């Protein structure tokens, strides 16, 4: 069993409580020579979403912290659903105010904010985007005086892509174009891109 599998198995044990890197080094008896590789392994596992780091710099598997990994299925009105990776796990409704810059089909980690109550579906909030699904977006270029934007053809991508004048690369109003996303959206900002 490799170090990743050993760490995952350990963190999934019922008695496991989130630990920081020094505690894990002590438990696994990691030598100074092995430390760099061990730390890098934790970072890779975190990027993959198999473990998460709490705000106190402790590591745990997402499920033990009430977190769920999956893909976002967006609706043109701005809300979405998390389609969980874990078999048997039910979908989670994500209100538009809790989508936090995630776009359709992005792989994310969601924190449950409300469980099933009185027939209402459980709800969650995107707390981390693990992998972006839409790096190039097809849409209609719309020009304005100081900038332009691309309105995606896929209505599930419900945010226009801002295009600066220098990045329009000869596109004219009404052209069907491909925009490559250069800055991802967040709560307060639309995605930015360049016309290819």
Stretches found by the model and what they are:
Residues 1-196:
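Charge-lined substrate channels and their catalytic hotspots, especially those that engage the 3′ end
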């Amino acid at each position: 069993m490799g170090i990743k599998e050993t760490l995952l198995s350990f963190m999934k044990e019922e008695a496991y409580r989130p630990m920081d890197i020094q505690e894990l080094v002590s438990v696994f008896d990691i030598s100074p020579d092995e430390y760099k590789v061990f730390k890098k392994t934790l970072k890779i596992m975190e990027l993959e979403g198999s473990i998460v780091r709490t705000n106190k710099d402790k590591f745990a598997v997402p499920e033990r912290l009430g977190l769920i990994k999956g893909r976002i299925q967006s609706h043109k009105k701005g809300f979405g659903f998390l389609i969980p990776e874990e078999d048997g796990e039910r979908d989670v409704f994500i209100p538009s105010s809790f989508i936090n810059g995630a776009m359709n089909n992005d792989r994310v980690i969601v924190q449950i904010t409300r469980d099933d109550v009185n027939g209402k579906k459980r709800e969650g909030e995107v707390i981390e985007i693990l992998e972006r699904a839409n790096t190039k977006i097809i849409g209609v270029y719309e020009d304005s005086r100081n900038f332009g934007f691309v309105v995606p053809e896929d209505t599930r991508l419900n945010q226009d892509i801002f295009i600066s004048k220098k990045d329009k690369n000869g596109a004219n109003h009404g052209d069907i174009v491909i925009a490559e996303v250069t800055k991802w959206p967040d709560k307060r900002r639309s995605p930015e891109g360049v016309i290819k």
